[in-house]
């Protein structure tokens, strides 16, 4: 396995499966991560996952990705989407392409969730498709970093 993709999960995503399942679904974060790792392995891609409820820890993990040769980041910034200039600056600072993913359709929710500090810099945004959004993002990421991959 050569290329690496990093999946970052933001605050409260450790509660998936328990927190508001009518909004976020019934799968746990562990279920989602296992599915993504299996999907990446089929394409001979190394996939790392990271979750934190702390903005600074997520910023540190993004910085670390640059030294690890990560080719693409899939990020669900959760509530930090709407508040974190630090997260935006970290992603721009490492210059690793990223895809923004949200389980729920943030545009169909409260007005404060409609703004993202990341979307205008992301290569793509997927929202409202539940856990399947991560899988779609990973499909695209694999294609992006391995254009000749037949999968």
Curated annotation (Swiss-Prot):
Gene Ontology MF terms in the entry: 3-dehydroquinate dehydratase activity
Which Pfam family, just one, is annotated for this protein? DHquinase_II
GO BP annotations of the record are: amino acid biosynthetic process; aromatic amino acid family biosynthetic process; chorismate biosynthetic process; quinate catabolic process
User: Could you tell me which CDD domains the record lists for this protein?
Assistant: DHQase_II (cd00466)
Protein's pathway = Metabolic intermediate biosynthesis; chorismate biosynthesis; chorismate from D-erythrose 4-phosphate and phosphoenolpyruvate: step 3/7
Under the heading PROSITE patterns, the entry gives: DEHYDROQUINASE_II
Q: What is its EC number?
A: 4.2.1.10
- Note the site residues: Transition state stabilizer: 19
Instruction: Indicate the residues that form the catalytic site.
Output: 24 (proton acceptor), 102 (proton donor)
**Reaction(s) catalysed by this chain's protein:** 3-dehydroquinate = 3-dehydroshikimate + H2O
* Source organism superkingdom: Bacteria
The UniProt subunit note reads as follows:
Homododecamer.
Put simply, this protein is called 3-dehydroquinate dehydratase
Question: Organism, per UniProt?
Answer: Acinetobacter baumannii (strain ATCC 17978 / DSM 105126 / CIP 53.77 / LMG 1025 / NCDC KC755 / 5377)
